[in-house]
Amino acid sequence: MLFRSTMLCDIHTGEWDEKLLALLDIPREILPEIKSSSEIYGTFECMGAQLCLAGIAGDQQSALFGQTCFESGEAKNTYGTGCFLLAHTGQRAVESKHGLLTTVVAGEKGRPIEYALEGSVFVGGAVVRWLRDELKLIHDSSDSEYFARKVADSAGVYLVPAFSGLGAPTWDMHARGTILGLTAGTGKNHIIRAALESIAYQTEDVIAAMNADVAALNGGEGSNAISLLKVDGGASANDLLMQMQSDFSAITVQRAANAEATAAGAAFLAGLAVGFFADREELKGLTGAKRSFEPRMSEDERKVRLGGWHRAVSACRKFSESEE
């Protein structure tokens, strides 16, 4: 349902917002009919065959579907150039108080509207590319894990990759990248490890915001909204990064057998529309975990690490204030 990207729709009704149309003097007649993400929209001819156009979704909504996150509390994170985390909230449109977006998830024709909380991290795998292309610390992206494993930790070094500001949940366009905690003993391996840690730290900030939003709805009671994080995307192949994520977020991280969850979601949506797949239960049987990562870090160490990260982010933002 790409209609939401126009900002002219009412996500609660699934219809165009008549008040906004009137305010902006947009005739309702020029807008297309709103359709679900999984139904037959039309046919076209290709090499003499009639083919159906039967599925459409935004890339992250498609990845959520491809990971078969169909129930409230199920979440996925795509580790690409940036990181994009969506947590399903069922038929409840949660209005975030912690810097997240409320989005409509992809679904089939005839189903009730379902929602998710969404948080975007601007620099995910891009920080590894920066290590490779600009600092020349590694020759290939996969080298980052090799060198990061040569040290037990980052030795107090924090890298905040705010190359183009900070995304969710901070949303600070003025922030700029920083490396803090350097000593005479800091080596390239510490910096590489700190770069990988920054991806996991930023993702944990989004997870914490999601948990806080759900806790607020429940009157501050109940367990965290996210206890399992399904992951995909190129950087999800990095075992060390996935273990860091599990440790920093204190949750199980489950790597998909198919790293291309967005493509899988598109195929699932189209397949359901034309009857190639019977239902969502069949889709669940087609997906699975390649590997799971469980938390190994103590809660005390986790709090110390996250505290250092949040101080580094604060210092990064404070430094940038002088440029505003």
What are these language model-derived features?
Residues E39, I56-Q60, T78-G82, S227-L229, ...:
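A short acidic Gly-Thr/Ser loop motif
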Residues D10-H12:
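Short beta-strand to alpha-helix junction loop
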Residues T6-M7, S62-F65, C83-A87, L159:
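Short beta-strand scaffold segments in enzyme catalytic cores
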Residues I40-L51, G55-E74, A87-Q91:
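Conserved phosphate-binding catalytic cores of ATP/NTP-utilizing and phosphoryl-transfer enzymes
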Residues M1, T6, K35, T89-E324:
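Glycine/Thr-rich phosphate-binding loops that ligate phosphate moieties of nucleotide
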